Structures are given as C-alpha cells and as structure tokens.
C-alpha cells in the first residue's frame, strides 16, 4: 500500500515529494506547457488517522471571489494538485462490493465527471467533495469518511471533454 505523509509519497523504493513530481512541469521548466493545464491526481493516504463526520448547521452565506487576469503567467500558473484526502488522513477503497471496487475518490470522480460533462474541473472537484461528504456509500461504520482536497492555480477554466462511447452491439 502506498501512503502519502508530510514528507511525500511513500513507495517501496523510498519517498517522492509531490513538489518533485510537479517541478518539471512548471512554466520555468516546461516552456511548451505554458498556458496549458497540468493536472496531478494523487490517489494515496496522507496520514494514519480516520476522518469522521461531524454534525453542523448549514449557513446561508455565499461568498464571491474577484477574478483577475495577468498578462504574463507566473511559474506555478495552470497547475492543479488533486489529493484523494486531506493531510493526516486515510484514503479508502472498496474491495468486497458486488457493485463496484476501487478507490473512493477515483470512483466518485468518474461518476461526477460523467454527470457533469460540461462543467469545469473545479466544479467537478467541488461536486466530488460533496459526494464523498454526504453519500453513505462512502462511509465506514456510519462515521469514518474521506474528504478530497485540491490546490488550484489555474489561470482559466479547464473542461474535461470525453469522447462518447460507442455502444457495442451483441
């Protein structure tokens, strides 16, 4: 099992820092990628604790952020790092279900991306976060859960455009 801690992604051969994975694709190192989105999806644990659900009262407050555009792009522009869970917590997978198997984050991401084919990546990721937070299918013992996290430095909206699958005739 691969685990990600504060120091990086633990592998069989050692630890790899997420920044070491991203660095070659930054705008100061990969000129042909300037202005193009670079997406890194890290499906791994980020610690040894189980996240639990807490009760809350939902406020009716909406915040709007101003958006500004730069004429030149900063070194870290157009990079998005997507983590299956927040720092310090487990990332879960289902291994014994008859309906589906696999990592909760990846399953939720695929399902939401299919439901929202015209949405940009940050809308999709927000919907994935919501899905993992409220859907009881992504819980253990009605309490333990997983919450993804992303760090986005996108200078424009990014849309996933999938090809329609052809139906196979029997």
What are these regions (language model features)?
Residues 1-170:
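Cysteine endopeptidase catalytic domains of the caspase/legumain-like
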């Amino acid at each position: 099992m691969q685990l990600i801690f504060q120091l990086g992604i633990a592998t069989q051969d050692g630890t790899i820092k997420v920044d070491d994975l991203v660095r070659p694709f930054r705008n100061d190192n990969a000129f042909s990628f300037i202005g193009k989105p670079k997406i890194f999806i890290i499906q791994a644990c980020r610690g040894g604790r189980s996240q639990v659900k807490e009760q809350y009262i939902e406020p009716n407050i909406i915040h709007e952020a101003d958006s500004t555009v730069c004429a030149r792009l900063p070194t870290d522009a157009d990079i998005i790092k997507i983590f299956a869970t927040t720092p310090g917590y487990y990332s879960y997978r289902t291994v014994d279900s008859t309906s589906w198997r696999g990592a909760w984050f990846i399953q939720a991401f695929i399902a939401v991306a299919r439901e929202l084919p015209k949405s940009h990546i940050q809308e999709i990721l927000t919907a994935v976060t919501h899905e993992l937070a409220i859907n009881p299918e992504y819980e253990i013992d009605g309490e333990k859960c997983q919450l993804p996290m992303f760090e986005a430095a996108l200078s424009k909206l990014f849309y996933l455009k999938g090809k329609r699958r052809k139906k196979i005739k029997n």
